Design a protein with these regions (language model features):
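Surface-exposed assembly/interface segments
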Residues: 1-316
Length: 316
């Protein structure tokens, strides 16, 4: 008798909520398991799970043959951009800085981190589609290898297009339409983009938010393939996070309490660093793991993780 799960572990068995607590999973992560079915047995095999965080803000299209490494700092002049505030408007100098969180032959997926003034003052900023702190629809960006200070006569790359990352994220199902194509659900039809919670921001943390959906992929439960069984939105990677006093938003604790179908186990494999511990020389943050308190943490990112529960077995 085993629970269906997503992850690299060989198997897992959690008999009940009481057993979950007895195993210490209420306080400790489950190694090698991203999510697990609430009760053991084969019934949960095939349930589709999708998790999304704010892995990137924009996708830049660059010339074929791109070899830029994940973690590279990306900069672009901000000179002349106009910022509106309560006291009127001001004109920016300096540059916008981001970090590469994924790199392909023709694209750079980039997360916006900060504005650096001409005087060298670093201010954390948040991307907003069509806003001030982003990379222009096309143009030139500077590239600086992680661990090196930004220089203005370094490596540049011209890109032909910058598109919104979140708008292009989908939940891909194993069920297909009449033409044999996989059914897909657009993430922006499910929820607003995740980012940084108010709780984490107040403690100097960033990028803790995530969404989780549970889907009846084959229609085994509802009779309708692709039905969303549960939506858990604006959860947090931070262990101490709360929506309000006494109301947890920590993803594992929240799912253990609220979800009918799944427990949260531990961060997905292969999370990517989304910040620098020393911005002046772009030293990658080495303490970005999920499932720790929010204070001062730039939480690592995973993008979209979509998988089917499997490995659940009955007696015999």
């Amino acid at each position: 008798l085993k629970n269906a799960f997503v992850g690299a572990a060989s198997s897992i068995r959690i008999k009940s909520d009481t057993h979950y607590n007895q195993l210490g999973y209420d306080d400790n992560t489950i190694t090698g398991v991203t999510v697990a079915a609430k009760t053991p047995g084969s019934y949960a095999n095939g349930i589709r799970i999708s998790i999304i965080d704010s892995a990137a803000d924009q996708i830049l299209t660059v010339p074929s043959g791109n070899t830029v490494q994940v973690g590279t700092a990306v900069t672009q002049t901000a000179v002349g951009r106009i910022v509106s505030g309560a006291g009127g408007t001001s004109v920016l100098d300096g540059y916008v800085k981001g970090i590469v969180t994924k790199s392909t032959d023709t694209t750079l997926e980039v997360k916006v981190l900060s504005h650096v003034s001409a005087a060298g003052t670093v201010t954390n900023v948040n991307y907003q589609q069509g806003g001030i702190y982003n990379f222009t629809p096309s143009g030139l960006v500077g590239l600086t290898t992680a661990g090196s200070a930004v220089v203005f006569n370094g490596v540049d790359v011209t890109y032909t297009q910058a598109v919104d990352w979140f708008e292009r994220q989908e939940v891909v199902l194993t069920s297909t339409d009449a033409n044999g194509n996989p059914l897909k659900i657009e993430w922006d039809a499910i929820a607003d983009r995740p980012g940084t919670s108010t709780y984490a921001a107040a403690r100097g943390g960033r990028f803790d938010e995530l969404h989780v959906v549970v889907i009846d992929d084959k229609g085994k439960i509802t009779g309708n393939a692709g039905t969303i069984l549960e939506k858990h939105l604006n959860l947090s990677k931070a262990k101490d996070a709360e929506y309000s006093v006494g109301s947890t938003s920590y993803w594992r604790k929240y799912l253990a309490t609220v979800s009918q179908y799944i427990y949260g186990g531990s961060e997905p494999a292969g999370i990517t660093t989304a910040g620098y511990s020393i911005p002046s020389n772009n030293t990658l943050d080495a303490d970005s793991g999920w499932d720790q308190d929010a204070d001062g943490v730039n939480f690592g990112v995973s993008g979209v993780i979509t998988a089917s529960l499997g490995g659940g077995t009955n007696y015999g």
